[in-house]
């Protein structure tokens, strides 16, 4: 069983904070038309996400704040870039709306599960779909070199994200709508 602490200042959490601070940098690079630099920065940010998770697990630096902050940083980065790309005409509006609805439902399900004393952990399929979504976002930065194929990458990633969401909802349905064992009904 993994050990969790209340400590905030450790390497994984600092890497997560760096990711949060780099969101406006990535967005600004995109808006200013510096797509290659924006893409490189986005990829580096994604690599810090992998690194902080690895360090946290390997060296027992998992914290309660990190468990919450890490996925928030991931979502904020992805959504910020997707919104920016939509405003720039790089990503169709329906893709952004689909991702917003999915993330809103995930947030609602997680909040309901938490209210009932449960947690809804992510799984490998969800992590793979998130990786592919980030890959498609990175491809959007390099669309000058990829042509329209970056959109096909995004559509495949979006399809997998939707499948992962459906699977997540089915697997976690009971956790979302039932009280944890030992909890009293109100």
Language-model-derived ranges and their functions:
Residues 1-186:
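Alpha-helical transmembrane bundles and membrane-interface segments of multipass inner-membrane proteins
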């Amino acid at each position: 069983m993994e050990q969790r602490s209340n400590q905030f200042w450790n390497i994984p959490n600092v890497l997560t904070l760096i990711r949060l601070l780099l969101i406006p940098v990535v967005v600004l690079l995109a808006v200013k038309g510096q797509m290659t630099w924006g893409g490189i920065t986005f990829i580096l940010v994604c690599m810090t996400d992998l690194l902080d998770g690895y360090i946290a697990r390997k060296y027992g630096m998992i914290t309660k704040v990190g468990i919450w902050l890490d996925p928030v940083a991931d979502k904020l980065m992805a959504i910020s870039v997707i919104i920016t790309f939509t405003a720039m005409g790089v990503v169709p509006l329906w893709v952004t709306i689909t991702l917003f609805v999915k993330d809103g439902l995930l947030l609602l399900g997680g909040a309901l599960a938490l209210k009932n004393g449960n947690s809804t952990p992510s799984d490998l399929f969800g992590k793979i779909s998130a990786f592919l979504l980030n890959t498609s976002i990175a491809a959007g930065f390099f669309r000058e070199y990829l042509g329209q194929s970056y959109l096909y990458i995004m559509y495949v990633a979006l399809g997998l994200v939707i499948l992962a969401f459906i699977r997540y909802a089915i697997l976690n349905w009971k956790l979302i709508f039932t009280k944890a064992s030992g909890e009293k009904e109100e």
